[in-house]
Amino acid sequence: MARTVNCVKLKREAEGLDYPPYPGELGARIWREISKESWEEWKQIQTRLVNENRLNLADARARKYLQQQMERFLFEDGTVEAQGYVPPSA
């Protein structure tokens, strides 16, 4: 049986993650409070942020920026998107 969480992003019960996706206390919080659906949505946004902003993940500032954007997206109801990103038309 799949683990469910009360996802703070979706504001409803949803399937939880199988394991903490990030190290430390933040990873444990994500595991407790964020659904698989919200995490997958974040991973797509994260990819766009890295690509559109040409972030170098070896740079500590880039990693800090991504962590801030992740927390904003997952826990603060913030809209996060890469500057200049245009979604494909339907």
Curated annotation (Swiss-Prot):
UniProt key word Iron: yes
GO molecular function: iron ion binding
Top-rank lineage group of the source organism: Bacteria
Keyword annotations from UniProtKB, A to Z: Iron
Pfam families: Iron_traffic
UniProt cross-references to InterPro entries, sorted A to Z: Fe_traffick_prot_YggX, Fe_traffick_prot_YggX_sf
GO CC, alphabetical: cytosol
GO annotation, biological process: cellular response to oxidative stress
Matches recorded under HAMAP family: Fe_traffic_YggX
Family, similarity comment: Belongs to the Fe(2+)-trafficking protein family.
Biological function: Could be a mediator in iron transactions between iron acquisition and iron-requiring processes, such as synthesis and/or repair of Fe-S clusters in biosynthetic enzymes.
Entry protein name: Probable Fe(2+)-trafficking protein
Organism: Bordetella avium (strain 197N)
Taxonomic placement: Bacteria, Pseudomonadati, Pseudomonadota, Betaproteobacteria, Burkholderiales
